[in-house]
């Protein structure tokens, strides 16, 4: 009901002229985007999202991400520099943050997370109402709306994040991976993530490999994970779940890995890379993800939690984290750790440091670090680190260049070398190095 009410109000905003002219374009752009995501939710609910052709998927994906693509970013309100230039310093930073948060609606619509859509809608409407007043709002009034939206709904957003990491019943991605016809690349567009030609090329390349090669890749990955428990003397039999973190495009290998893990008695969890600022890590993402539509956009918004990070918020977040893990403690106790697929060969990135982007003050930086330390203690209580393990395997992406196919096949060969033989060889090198005082590294 709240969703329907908020969407009805958002439809009205699209045609109203009740806020000062300078701010109308911002509110129209954001409401147009919200309405697009509302259409996605309808398509999910009536089943038509599942039936998209490859071309329809590409068109929808482009429409949803077009605003943050590099060619449009310079005149996008998600760009804090542009927002400040057009809306003023105080409003611009806050309203750019709000739009970036609302862009999470793409994922919420694809996953059918209606309450998350409501949270963004209601924050936008409340701020729009402030601009409808006889005088312009103070920046603090806008910031207060954003602060309390983040704080009040922390028990929704953070709790879901905890559940996402340990509960195999949340199977949005797993259903796509295990039930789709992977030879039809339209499945890539059902994740809701940005899909570039890289993901399509990777998926098409994996589709071209013989079943034996795919099995080899998956076996090396899953065997390495299971062997990690043996090497560290940890009891895998006590565990029931493993989290697979991987780059979208590798579904054919991942499907086989799921079968392998299930044969070993482990259900697979697919936790998406965090969407909202409350769950994002400024240092990078963890979870399944695609390539970014714009790495400068990610960089500009990496410290967006500076909008609300204070001691009261930190304390609230830790309290919610404890409650969430208590709620999912059985799932947490059954969790064995992550199995990670990484990639290499992506082009380099030179970020631009923008003064208009949010950044932590020294005090906020300390609060954030304190939260990280406190949260690690909470997580370790429910998922003891001495009971889990992990594995990491890496493959090239097409962006590595013309030799992609050759490098990929060579990577498979190296990854599938005789473990026993090379383990013994490496141990001999380690034994010799243990007798040394220092190592001199030479070369180019």
Describe the residue ranges of each PLM region:
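Active-site bordering "gate/hinge" segments
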Residues: 1-444
């Amino acid at each position: 009901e709240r969703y329907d009410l908020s969407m009805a109000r958002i439809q009205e905003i699209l045609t109203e002229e009740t806020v000062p002219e300078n701010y109308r374009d911002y509110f129209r752009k954001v409401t147009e985007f919200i309405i697009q995501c509302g259409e996605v939710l309808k398509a999910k609910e009536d089943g038509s999202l599942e039936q998209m052709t490859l071309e329809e998927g590409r068109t929808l994906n482009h429409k949803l991400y077009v605003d943050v693509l590099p060619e449009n970013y310079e005149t996008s309100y998600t760009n804090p520099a542009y927002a400040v230039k057009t809306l003023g310093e105080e409003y611009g930073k806050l309203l750019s943050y709000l739009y970036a948060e609302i862009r999470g609606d793409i994922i919420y619509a694809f996953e059918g997370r209606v309450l998350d859509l409501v949270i963004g809608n209601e924050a936008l409407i409340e701020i729009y109402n402030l601009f409808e007043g006889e005088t312009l709002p103070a920046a603090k009034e806008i910031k207060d709306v954003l602060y309390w939206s983040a704080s009040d709904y922390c028990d929704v957003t953070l709790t879901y994040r905890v559940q996402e990491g340990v509960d195999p019943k949340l199977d949005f991605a797993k259903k796509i991976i295990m039930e789709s016809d992977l030879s039809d690349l339209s499945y890539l567009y059902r994740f809701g993530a940005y899909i570039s030609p890289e993901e399509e090329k990777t998926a098409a390349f994996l589709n071209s490999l013989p079943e034996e090669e795919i099995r080899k890749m998956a076996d090396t990955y899953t065997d390495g994970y299971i062997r990690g428990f043996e090497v560290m003397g940890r009891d895998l039999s006590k565990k029931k779940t493993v989290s697979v973190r991987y780059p979208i495009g590798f579904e054919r290998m991942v499907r086989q890995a799921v079968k392998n893990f299930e044969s070993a008695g482990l259900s697979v969890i697919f936790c998406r890379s965090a969407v909202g600022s409350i769950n994002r890590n400024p240092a990078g993402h963890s979870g399944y993800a695609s390539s970014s539509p714009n790495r400068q956009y990610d960089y500009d918004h990496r410290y967006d939690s500076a909008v609300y990070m204070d001691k009261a918020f930190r304390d609230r977040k830790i309290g919610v984290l404890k409650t969430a893990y208590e709620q999912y403690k059985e799932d947490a106790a059954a969790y064995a750790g992550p199995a990670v697929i990484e990639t290499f060969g992506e082009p380099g990135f030179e970020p631009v440091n923008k003064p208009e982007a949010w950044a932590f003050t020294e005090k906020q930086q300390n609060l954030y670090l304190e939260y990280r330390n406190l949260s690690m203690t909470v997580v370790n209580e429910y998922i003891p680190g001495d009971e889990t393990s992990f594995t990491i395997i890496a493959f090239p992406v097409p962006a590595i260049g013309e030799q992609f196919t050759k490098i990929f096949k060579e990577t498979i060969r190296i990854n599938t070398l005789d473990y026993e033989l090379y383990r013994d060889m490496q141990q001999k090198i380690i034994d010799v190095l243990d007798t040394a005082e220092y190592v001199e590294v030479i070369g180019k």
